[in-house]
Amino acid sequence: TELLQMVTEAPQRVFEIGCGSGATGHALKQKFQGIEFVGLEPDANAARIAESRLDKIIVSDIEKVHLEAYGLKKEYFDLIICADVLEHLYDPWKTLFTLRDYLKPDGKVIASIPNTQNINLIINLLNGHWTYEKHGLLDATHVRFFTLNEIEKMFTGTGYKIVRCSFAKQPKLENIRWPATIDFGKIVLKNITREEATRLFVVQYFVIAQKNIS
């Protein structure tokens, strides 16, 4: 997956929020031998599976847990993973600020976050629809919604600097002369740049943010 590919250097200690059944941790432990991987997962059934794959499992909600009560030390982890997690939290800002304390001075957070600026959502909203679904951009369990600008503000406002932000390639935009006019029927975007258009087609952003100690 894109998220696994973003981990290019072997971390010593990793903490994943919402680790599920431990698939990501299992893959990273195979990729990098000898790493310590701690997972937090609120679903007891998924956590039970993860126990056999990871070094330590905390069965709890990140917004309610006291991490020190589980023996986690400050400035301990090289990497914290939040894959499709932050949009499910009532206060992701507080969570990121808290997690910062558990990162080493040069530690990083990797996160994947849905893009609410996606053109399909905008068109549906124009037509009066904002229909929640079981999966996808309007997953019924999402409680926060982010554009790229808001993602950047969230990380910088909680003590991080973004070192990389990526997304899946957009082949639809390859053979267009920019700036361009793009006609979506009821919506016509005039004199739009490639960067502006890209933000409308991205489904999910992949962010690497480093603890800011300056």
Question: PLM ranges: what are they?
Answer:
Residues 2, 23, 42-45, 63, ...:
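S-adenosyl-L-methionine-dependent methyltransferase catalytic module, highlighting the catalytic core
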Residues 12-20:
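Conserved class I S-adenosyl-L-methionine
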Residues 81:
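A conserved beta-strand element that flanks and buttresses the S-adenosyl-L-methionine
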Residues 66-75:
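Short amphipathic alpha-helix with an adjacent loop that forms part of the alpha/beta core around
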Residues 85:
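Hydrophobic adenine-recognition pocket in adenosine-nucleotide-binding enzymes
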Residues 28:
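Aromatic pocket-lining residues of Rossmann-like dinucleotide-binding sites
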Residues 1-11:
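Conserved alpha-helix/loop element of class I SAM-dependent methyltransferases that forms part
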Residues 23, 31, 35-66:
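Class I SAM-dependent methyltransferase SAM/SAH-binding core
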